[in-house]
Amino acid sequence: LGDVYKRQIHAHDWLTYPAGVHAKMVSGKPLCIHVHATDFDRSRGKVNPTVYATEKNGMDYADCIMCVSELTRQTVIREYHQDPRKCFAMHNAVYPLSQELLDIPRPEHKKEKVVTFLGRITMQKGPEYFVEAAALVLKRTRNIRFIMAGSGDMLDAMINLAAERGIADRFHFPGFQRGRQVYEAYKNSDVFVMPSVSEPFGIAPLEAMQCGTPSIISKQSGCGEILDKVIKTDYWDIYAMADAIYSICTNPSLFEYLQVEGKKEVDGITWEKVGLRIRALYENVLKNYGK
């Protein structure tokens, strides 16, 4: 980036906005803020007034607002009353997998298919829709196991829901996964599902696709703006989600298409390309600052 980054301030998400605003006032340098999520995403619309005020103040002072998706950009414009001309969609990307992760084997000749949810088990992520879709799938076949990996304030409720639906024997809750465990989970899966209610971006499907695992994502996910080789359903449409899961698990041709083409697609989504776009935006901010 040369010295471009030295001539402006870049603050990431609401906890850093007050420091960014203060640095701008003291230094006179332009402020770029990066919105990875808003409180509308985290709370399903039940916004904390203090958090909202901090977010909006940072946006009001910002000379440039980078959002991780067009979905988030529209939230910033609509809910925080920001000028569209200073708001930009800046999608996330993935780094190439290390050789160590590439060498993790995919199990062959499994007797049962594995469908995985991996992430925070909170209301933003829509875990209950995954459980309900699983219950529908298991009415059609018992040859599939479902995994909900992660932790969060809805974990106990999801364990109880699986029991209420009579699918506890087909459902597993291995807890929080870290590092290599995450990629082992992806590679052990036949389908990855991200049923988020409001997902500013969502990096997990890209990681799963890197591992050759077909993905199903909600239409309310920002990553869907740059992914085509996935199946997209509304988060609340458990019937469409169940159909997609069942189809991938029972149709080898569909599985292979999403596996091969999905990996090709995600391999072209790199941080180097994103970095060039950010640099160009930095330069544009500097050129126009103070005009």
For the regions a language model picked out, list residue spans one by one.
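Short alpha-helical donor nucleotide-sugar binding micro-motif in glycosyltransferases
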Residues: F176-Q177, E184-S189
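Conserved donor-binding/catalytic core segment of Leloir-type glycosyltransferases
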Residues: E108-A134, Q259
